[in-house]
């Protein structure tokens, strides 16, 4: 009986220590396919580049450019708010124009595709 109780206690402790990803379709590793800049009226095909947004829990990481960016985000309704803690040198390479407080409208989000739009850019991603 003591062994069973000890085993149950261990299982409960192990299960309670895990954090569950509450991001739904947003969580994961996203490869940027296209960056459309409204200011310059240009569309940049980024499929050959390695521009990635990694999203997990409330953290995000930007990789593929000259430097790595790390920050936090909030997904509220149809908006994604990004606050970078470690701002990459080439932050516009990732579609950020105000890396300390950027807001994106979530145009489309499912398990395979994400489209974000700010007042400066529109970003197309596919899940990697």
Regions picked out by a protein language model, each given a short descriptive name:
Residues 6-8:
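Sec-dependent N-terminal signal peptides
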Residues 24-40:
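Tryptophan-anchored aromatic micro-motifs
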Residues 13-16:
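C-terminal motif of bacterial Sec signal peptides marking the signal peptidase cleavage site
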Residues 46, 82-107:
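An anionic, turn-rich surface loop/hairpin at beta-sheet edges
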Residues 72-79, 113-128:
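Edge beta-strand at a domain terminus
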Residues 43-81, 85-89:
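N-terminal glycine/threonine-rich, aromatic-flanked beta-hairpin/loop signature
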């Amino acid at each position: 009986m003591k062994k069973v109780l000890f085993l149950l206690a261990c299982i409960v402790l192990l299960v309670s220590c895990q954090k569950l990803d509450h991001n739904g379709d947003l969580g994961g590793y996203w490869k940027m396919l296209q960056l459309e800049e409204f200011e310059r009226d240009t569309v940049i095909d980024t499929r050959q580049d390695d521009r990635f947004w990694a999203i997990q829990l409330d953290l995000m990481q930007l990789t593929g450019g000259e430097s790595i960016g790390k920050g936090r985000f909030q997904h509220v309704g149809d908006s994604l708010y990004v606050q970078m803690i470690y701002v990459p040198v080439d932050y516009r390479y990732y579609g950020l124009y105000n890396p300390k407080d950027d807001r994106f409208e979530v145009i489309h989000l499912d398990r395979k595709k994400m489209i974000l739009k700010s007042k400066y850019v529109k970003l197309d991603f596919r899940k990697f």
